[in-house]
Structures are given as structure tokens and as C-alpha cells.
Design a protein with these regions (language model features):
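Flexible glycine-/small-residue-rich
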Residues: 2-5, 82, 96-98, 185, ...
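Conserved nucleotide-binding/hydrolysis micro-motifs of P-loop NTPases
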Residues: 5-8, 141, 169-171, 187-189, ...
Length: 405
């Protein structure tokens, strides 16, 4: 569905337009040209004296008679010119009313989504009654709400023997089984490749369907994937990269700018399987996690491009052990301190590290650590996280080769 290519004249009567094709397929020959031309030929433009134009034309007629015989020019008046079929084909188009009112506008003045749906509807008419129809649609989600995207998929699949969609929409992709999706990627050699999705044993089809939008889709659509052990890491690392890029853009970049999608693995036992899945799709895969047993560490390293593993038991301890007292006190001042923690810590600044540890434990997976990092200065963010952000930038944006002198 390309509005600039097809929809610009879909509902016109020009040769080759979708409406013209439908009329020919249905063997309808509109007998309107002669009557339309005759009606327009009898129509005089601005003939009403109240419009003021007839008086001007009368003055021209009087002035003309001063110079030439009357038979040379009589009664100037305005009419529609170029009354030919080809001219009418170009200027006639359908008007459509939208909303609950009666106001109509040319179809090409409708919104992009409306035009796309018009084109799809007309293509469906062309396809009806034909055998072995193949529908190939590029980005059908453009300017279309989610419920309509799903409707498009189901209607097109019913209508055609084979349907091919290219899409970046989770609402489109989740309508297909994993084995029906092919991931396209162009390598550095310029060759376009396709890879199928083979779910690892730890990812059951039910889980894949239930968590497709929230966990799998974004990573499928990106070139690079950062697999985080849990929700806390999945929120904290992007927040740190974004904050550092604001403070020192010459050294750091946000994960979004690097083309990295962050995926919550849901536990360290899932990292290796998910890493193998996305690596098989030709993506650069990175992982971040807490200290792991040697066997699990080796399995993860074998499945990803690079593993970032810190030495603490959890990321909350890593952050609180490597930040400043000023950063913790500033964050405490900005918090609406929970009632149950007010009782345990009447003066939280006196024991800021322990108080925030309890606070983060209650906000596990709820962006508590990410909110803390987002208010830190560069020196207040742990060295390990800063080094990880620098390493990711170096991996995704290798330095340019020196120019020859």
C-alpha cells in the first residue's frame, strides 16, 4: 500500500487507475461521457448578474463592437473548455464523506490511513473471484489503528491463497505463528538474508504468544539486542546510558541511538537460550547479569556476542555500593517516602544505603533503580556501568579508520 504510487489516483477514472481496472474487470462501460460533455457544454460559468461578472463581459462586448463588425465577436461568456473524454478522465474523481457529517472531500484529501484502506478495499474487489491470488503488502500498519491492522490480516488471508506482509508492527506480527515469520536482514556485504524463528526449549509457544508484544517483538525488529537478567537491569541500564549520553555525548550514547533493544529475560536461566535464539537470527546479542556460576557463565558466553557480568549478587547492591552519599540523599529528598519505611527509617538519610536498599526491594522491577540513576551525575554512576556503556558504544560504533595524510 503505497499512497504516493497507487492511491494518488485510485478513485479517479484515469486509464490504469484501480477504479478503471474494476470497471473493466466487471465489463462495465460507463456511458456517461457524451451526456456529461453535453451537460457541460450547455453550462455558462458565472451567468448570474449578481456575481458581477456578466457586467464586465457586457462591457467587453461593447468595446469590441467599436473596432470590429459584430459578426467577428458576439456576447463573450465563460464555459468549461477541453470537453474531451481524456480531459474528463483526469479531472473527475470520487468525493468521500468522513465522520457523521455530510461534508465530502476528494479521496486524495483524506488521511493516509483512510486512503490505504480504500486502496485495500479496491484491491480486494479486483481479487474476488480469482484463483490462486497472492497478496503482497508493504507496511500495512501505516496510519492504521491496531484493531484495523488485525482486521486487515484476517481479511487478506481469507481472500488470498498466499499473503506476504512486510511489517514492523507487533499487532501485525502477533497474528502469525513463529514459523510463519521470517526475519530479513541485510549484511555488511550487502546480501539480503532471511532467517526463521526457532523457539528454544525454555520458551514455550504459549509464553511466546502471551509475551510477544512486551518481550519478544522489539528485539525481533532490531539489529542489536541487550538481554537483561531481570526487569531491574532492563530498566536501569538503558536509563544509565541515556543519562550518561546527556552528560557527556562525546563519550556515551543512549542504547536507542546505538540501535540496541533491551530484553528482560525473566531470570538468569533464560539468558543463554534467548541469546542463542537472537544470535541465530543474525543479530548482535549482548547480555548483562549478576555473578553467575561458572557453568551458566560459559553457556551464556557461548550464546552471545559479549557478556557483561558484575561481581555483586544483584544490581541494587552494585549501584548503592558504588555511588555517593550526596546522590542517595538527593534521591531520598525527591521521594514520596512509603509509610512502612517511615516507621523503619524515621531519618532515612542517617542510613541512606540500607533505607534505599529496602526501598528498591519493594520496587523490584518497578524502575526504582532506573529512577535513581536518572538523577545522578556522571561520577555518581558506578564505574562498572559507565565502562559497560563505553564498551557498548565501541562495539556498535567502531572508530573510523584514520584518514591518509
Amino acid at each position: 500500500l503505497r499512497s504516493l504510487r497507487t492511491a494518488s489516483r485510485a478513485l479517479s477514472l484515469e486509464h490504469g487507475s484501480l477504479l478503471d481496472i474494476i470497471l473493466r474487470l466487471k465489463e462495465i462501460r460507463p456511458q456517461m461521457w457524451e451526456k456529461t460533455i453535453g451537460d457541460l457544454n450547455q453550462f455558462t460559468v458565472a451567468a448570474d448578474p449578481e456575481l458581477g461578472l456578466s457586467g464586465v463581459l457586457k462591457s467587453i462586448d461593447v468595446a469590441l463592437n467599436r473596432y470590429v463588425p459584430r459578426e467577428w465577436g458576439v456576447s463573450p461568456h465563460l464555459k468549461v473548455t477541453n470537453l474531451t473524454r481524456e480531459n474528463l478522465r483526469k479531472v473527475i474523481s470520487a468525493f468521500i464523506a468522513t465522520g457523521e457529517g455530510t461534508h465530502s472531500a476528494p479521496f486524495y484529501r483524506q488521511g493516509t490511513g483512510t486512503i490505504n484502506m480504500l486502496v485495500l478495499a479496491m484491491l480486494s474487489l479486483i481479487a474476488e473471484g480469482k484463483q490462486n491470488v497472492i497478496f503482497a503488502m508493504e507496511e500495512p500498519e501505516t496510519a492504521i489503528p491496531p484493531y484495523a491492522q488485525k482486521r486487515i490480516v484476517h481479511e487478506v488471508r481469507k481472500l488470498s491463497a498466499q499473503s506476504i506482509f512486510s511489517s514492523h508492527s507487533p499487532y501485525i506480527l502477533e497474528e502469525f505463528r513463529a514459523e510463519e515469520i521470517g526475519v530479513l536482514m541485510r549484511g555488511t556485504d550487502g546480501v539480503l538474508k532471511q532467517a526463521g524463528i526457532e523457539l528454544p526449549p525454555s520458551v514455550k509457544p504459549k509464553r511466546y504468544r502471551q509475551e510477544f508484544r512486551t518481550r519478544f517483538c522489539e528485539a525481533l525488529l532490531s539489529r542489536r539486542v541487550l538481554i537483561a537478567e531481570g526487569a531491574t537491569e532492563a530498566g536501569a541500564i538503558p536509563a544509565a546510558a541515556r543519562r550518561l549520553s546527556e552528560l557527556d555525548p562525546a563519550t556515551y550514547s543512549s542504547l536507542e541511538a546505538l540501535g540496541i533493544s533491551t530484553l528482560d529475560a525473566g531470570g538468569d536461566g533464560q539468558i543463554a537460550d534467548l541469546g542463542a535464539l537472537y544470535s541465530s537470527l543474525g543479530k548482535s546479542v549482548y547480555a548483562v547479569c549478576d555473578q553467575q556460576a561458572p557453568a551458566n557463565q560459559a553457556a551464556i558466553e557461548a550464546a552471545v556476542t559479549k557478556l557483561f557480568m558484575h561481581g555483586e549478587s544483584d544490581i541494587e547492591k552494585l549501584v548503592l555500593s558504588n555511588t555517593t552519599q550526596a546522590a542517595m540523599e538527593r534521591f531520598i529528598d525527591a521521594l514520596s517516602w512509603p509509610q512502612h519505611l517511615k516507621t523503619a527509617f524515621p531519618n532515612p538519610k542517617a542510613n541512606a544505603s540500607e533505607a534505599l536498599s529496602r526501598y528498591f526491594a519493594g520496587k523490584k522491577g518497578d524502575l526504582g533503580v532506573a529512577e535513581f540513576i536518572a538523577q545522578c551525575e556522571e561520577s555518581e554512576i558506578p564505574d562498572w556501568i559507565r565502562q559497560m556503556c563505553r564498551d557498548l558504544r565501541a562495539l556498535c560504533q567502531p572508530p573510523e579508520p584514520p584518514t591518509a595524510s
